[in-house]
Amino acid sequence: MKESNLSELLNRRLALLGERANLSLLEQCLHGIERECLRVTGEGRLAQTPHPEELGSALTNEQITTDYSESLLEFITPALKDPADTLASLDKIHRFAYSKLGNEYLWSPSMPCPLPAEEDIPIAYYGTSNIGQLKYVYRKGLALRYGKTMQCIAGIHYNFSLPEQLWPLLKQAEGFVGTDRDYQSSAYIALIRNFRRYSWLLMYLFGASPALDAGFLRGRSHQLEQLDAETLYLPYATSLRMSDLGYQSKAQAGLTPCYNDLNSYTDSLRKAVATPYAPYVEVGTHKDGEWVQLNTNILQIENEYYSNIRPKRVTYTGERPIQALMARGIQYVEVRCLDINPFLPLGIDIQEARFLDAFLLYCALNDSPLFENNECGNATSNFLAVVKEGRRPGLQLQRQGQPVEMKEWAAQLLEQIAPLAALLDQSHGSDVHSKALDAQLAKVKDSSLTPSAQVLAAMSEHKESFTQFSLRQSQAHAEYFRSQTLSKEEQAAFEEAARKSLEQQTELEQNEVGDFDVFVGAYQASILAISN
């Protein structure tokens, strides 16, 4: 590969990290995965049962919780150095969950099963403590603002951090004037800018939602095509989940946090959680004496902002995400645009994780100029073009104001990511990252190898609707997890964690002091009180 293709900055950083004294640093990256999935009946319909008590408390269990709906499970791994260990942890959580699910299944793809009427989709319930009620009212607000149907879409979140010792090393080499914390935050914001530039590539390579159940759109007008009586699709789509049919929010339309620095990012979110939005004001926070939303602002809380990647910092009890970021800077990023691959029991595999590491390292170490002119808008339109028609032959994207063929740009990007994969391999003493990259290059050369193409091919081969295909995959994965149970010790550890979480919730509820209305007021004030 010609080194001249890489930026001077990237070459310098590659050389520095390739030095013997620094090489082991890259083994210290941390990886965490969150996987959402709907609980469904044997007929592939939404399970209307409460969150199984044997899985513990959705409020306090660190590994098994619920997302939007009582029927939408979320599995959370610890952050580990080797993504193979992260996936092994996710696998064990699935096996434990299946030991308690009775005759229910975990729905394998991102797009939901046929859903009941909006009012019959149960909102996740977290008990009577103030924090539990806050989570519940927040979800009521989401239903009011966006409808419940959209909230039933599931995804994979990939949490990734570079080693803390890496930043002072780069900072010193580059003569950055300022604190280590400021350098680290600006480097993560630079990663996010590059992610915005290049994340369309992930949608082509890993998008796996080209079709959905026809009832999902609830009769709204759309540009999708009919595949069969029960299925809508787009022939060249990679990820309808990430297209504009997924989340449409007029309120959030004007909210495009600028990723120029951490301050401007937290600033725009702070304004959004403190700025009233007329249609929400009209509804108010209460109806018939009951809370219906936490407030009438553009965002109820900062996590309501919908984005493909988020800067993150672990929060202390009672602390808000913005407070943590402003106080202690960025600690890791959360990649939120990955579809669940319905052919994989976990929805993601080690090859995808190894490639993501190389891709994110490329985003972190490559030049990342500030967005200028219409570059931010182009990043959004490139992303939307690929999710809707990424496999269309000859598809063109915009690069620095010029049209470029997507496949040509994809191949060039993979060529530039190759030295990062090689560096990771050198650090780990293996060739797994380079092999993962080769597998992605094969998809660029042949679009039939992409998961989105394979979903449509499988449905066509078996003459199945989206729901029939998805149920078949869900049943196959259930068999996979149930065929190999956890060891007695592992099962006992999960059961103990579930039991402890229920005790914690009870304790929270019994020791609760103070009125919920006052609690919400204090929660609101905590944002307004932050001064730059």
From Swiss-Prot:
Give the reaction(s) catalysed: L-cysteine + L-glutamate + ATP = gamma-L-glutamyl-L-cysteine + ADP + phosphate + H(+)
Ordered alphabetically, the record's keywords are: ATP-binding, Glutathione biosynthesis, Ligase, Nucleotide-binding
Q: Does the keyword section mention ATP-binding?
A: yes
Pathway it works in:
Sulfur metabolism; glutathione biosynthesis; glutathione from L-cysteine and L-glutamate: step 1/2
Instruction: Please cite one Gene Ontology biological process associated with this protein.
Output: glutathione biosynthetic process
Q: Which GO terms describe its cellular component?
A: cytosol
Output the InterPro entries linked to this UniProt entry. Answer: Gln_synth/guanido_kin_cat_dom (IPR014746), Glu_cys_ligase (IPR007370), Glut_cys_ligase (IPR006334)
UniProt cross-references to SUPFAM superfamilies, sorted A to Z = Glutamine synthetase/guanido kinase (SSF55931)
Recorded GO molecular functions are: ATP binding; glutamate-cysteine ligase activity; metal ion binding
- Which enzyme type, at the first EC level? ligase
Superkingdom of origin organism: Bacteria
Report whether ATP-binding shows up as a keyword of the record: yes
Q: Cite the EC number.
A: 6.3.2.2
Family named by the database record: Belongs to the glutamate--cysteine ligase type 1 family. Type 1 subfamily.
Name of the featured protein: Glutamate--cysteine ligase
The taxonomic lineage of its organism, from the top, reads: Bacteria, Pseudomonadati, Pseudomonadota, Gammaproteobacteria, Pseudomonadales
